[in-house]
């Protein structure tokens, strides 16, 4: 028997590297400190997708700190995405080929890296909205990620 103040780990699938479904997405557990990476949406039929700041899994809340490479690759239905405020990393090719994606809102002020070709093939009139205190830094961070010059980054 496990004391009340400790979590039982026997038979638990909540191990680092395991994938879990929550809401409209699939998440991979990335750390023992209750962090996950958003892997991909459960289906690619949605026109709007919100990558949340946190998700509820079987043993509690987990912070969503990254978006996996190719998460929305070639998703032609997607028009709008919101990225939660705990995300620090956006993987390579995340929105690659999402040609109808016209609006990306980044709520996170913690973003440190954006992978190669993350924005390749998004709509040429896409607007990327970022926190106003991070406008200059994020313009640099999002530079040359495959998007057309007509893609706007605003606050």
Where are the language model's segments positioned?
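A structural signal for leucine-rich repeat
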Residues: 96, 117-121, 139-145
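Short intrinsically disordered, low-complexity segments
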Residues: 13-14, 70, 102
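Ser/Thr/Gly/Pro-rich low-complexity, disordered linker/stalk segments of secreted
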Residues: 1-18
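GGW-centered surface loops in extracellular recognition modules
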Residues: 21-42, 140-146
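Consensus positions within tandem repeat domains that build extended binding/scaffold surfaces
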Residues: 69-71, 91-94, 116-118
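Structural signature of tandem-repeat unit edges
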Residues: 2, 26, 31-32, 44-66, ...
């Amino acid at each position: 028997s496990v004391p009340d103040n400790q979590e039982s780990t026997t038979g638990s699938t909540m191990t680092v590297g395991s994938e879990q479904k929550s809401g409209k997405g699939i998440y991979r557990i990335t750390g023992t400190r209750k962090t996950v990476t958003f892997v991909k949406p459960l289906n690619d039929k949605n026109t709007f997708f919100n990558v949340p700041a946190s998700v509820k899994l079987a043993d509690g809340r987990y912070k969503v700190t990254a978006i996996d490479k190719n998460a929305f690759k070639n998703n032609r239905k997607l028009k709008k995405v919101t990225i939660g405020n705990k995300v620090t990393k956006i993987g390579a090719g995340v929105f690659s080929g999402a040609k109808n994606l016209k609006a990306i809102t980044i709520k996170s002020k913690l973003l440190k890296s954006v992978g190669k070709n993350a924005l390749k093939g998004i709509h040429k009139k896409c607007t990327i909205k970022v926190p106003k205190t991070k406008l200059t830094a994020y313009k640099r961070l999002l530079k040359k990620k495959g998007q057309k010059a007509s893609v706007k980054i605003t606050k």
